Regions:
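Non-catalytic, solvent-exposed segments at the cell envelope interface
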Residues: 2-20, 28-344
Length: 344
């Protein structure tokens, strides 16, 4: 009888210890979850289906756009544009590929939502452990669902994230999982929080930044401050290809920032997020963000980063349509490139 008592007592003790350990683990998990949600709640939220503009507002927008026009090129009619073949499958509509659209706004005083000045698709492929940054040129001529044909950046001004996502899906067959928007002025603050960004500068680039920010940079590798990185990202008049070089510089800065972040420890990363997230606007829920983070974090430090742009060299022509200077992409070639670089 005594032996049975001891065995029973031992079982109870083991059970108590096991339950205590389990309680500690569950409490820790709950604490992490609560902390994570508290961190995510620092972001600004917007409904993906932001209000669209009225017909009158759109007409005023188009008229203002024509008045600002300074480009040139052979004139063609809207009916001459070849929109390519039918799209059968969506790129990124799988568990191994996550497509997050990064939207940069250069909002002017009094504006609540401007044209998207920068659109960079961040594609994370868990299977190949790659991150691809794809810039979409703002003068790209596309079909905008419900609004006709215009520059791609107009879709954001007219219908926010949802319309921009629908535009990318209809024209390029890309499935967007979520959107992240940063105002360019906030972008400078983010760079400063990361301690600056390393960038190789040409002599003329350094001179431009110096003039723009009252700095004293020289050619070669430099650690740029937030204002200097923003100035660098906006350069478009030093090269013959203007806006193409500008988007290339933006991808360079973003790639360098990714490299800095992925080399940071968890404690440092959490500290950065605490400071950065209040500067970010998204249409994703906390659950969606944490779900994507759980998928990406294990491979993030080992991921290789590459970049590209749409349209690519040799896959577009610069023309005038209805008084607008636009880029008309070879849709079939462009979709083929995206299939090769973004598909799992």
């Amino acid at each position: 009888m005594k032996r049975k008592k001891k065995r029973s007592s031992g079982k109870r003790t083991a059970l108590v210890v096991l339950c205590s350990v389990l309680a500690v683990i569950l409490t820790a998990m709950l604490g992490v979850t609560v902390a994570a949600h508290s961190l995510m709640n620092k972001m600004n939220r917007v409904d993906g289906s932001q209000s669209t503009i009225s017909l009158e507002e759109m007409q005023a927008y188009l008229e203002n756009q024509k008045q600002e026009e300074t480009g040139s090129g052979p004139a063609i009619s809207d009916g001459d544009v070849d929109w390519g073949g039918m799209i059968s499958t969506l790129l990124g509509d799988s568990d191994d590929v996550i497509n997050i659209l990064l939207i940069g706004q250069d909002r002017r005083p009094g504006e609540t939502r401007a044209r998207s000045d920068s659109m960079i698709l961040c594609t994370v492929n868990r299977d190949s452990k790659t991150i691809v940054l794809t810039s979409f040129m703002r003068d790209l001529y596309v079909q905008i669902p419900g609004y006709g044909n215009n520059r791609i950046n107009a879709s954001y001004a007219w219908g926010g994230m949802e319309l921009l996502n629908k535009t990318l899906e209809q024209n390029f067959g890309i499935y967007i999982d979520g959107n992240v928007e940063v105002d360019f002025n906030q972008f400078a603050d983010i760079v400063d929080l990361l301690g600056g960004v390393p960038m190789e500068l040409r002599k003329d680039e350094a001179a431009y930044i110096n003039s723009d920010t009252q700095s004293s940079l020289s050619a070669g590798m430099q650690m740029l401050s937030g204002k200097q990185a923003l100035s660098y990202s906006r350069i478009r008049n030093l090269d013959a290809d203007a806006d193409f070089s500008r988007t290339n510089r933006q991808r360079k800065v973003l790639s360098a920032l990714f490299d800095q972040v992925k080399d940071s420890g968890l404690t440092t990363l959490l500290g950065l997020l605490d400071e950065v997230l209040p500067m970010v606007t998204t249409d994703m829920s906390n659950g969606e963000i944490l779900g994507y983070a759980a998928k990406v974090f294990p491979m993030f430090s080992k991921a290789t980063i590459s970049s590209q742009r749409v349209p690519a060299d040799g896959a577009y022509k610069g023309v005038m349509i209805d008084g607008m200077s636009v880029l008309v992409a070879d849709m079939d070639l462009t979709r083929q490139m995206l299939q090769e670089t973004l598909a799992d």
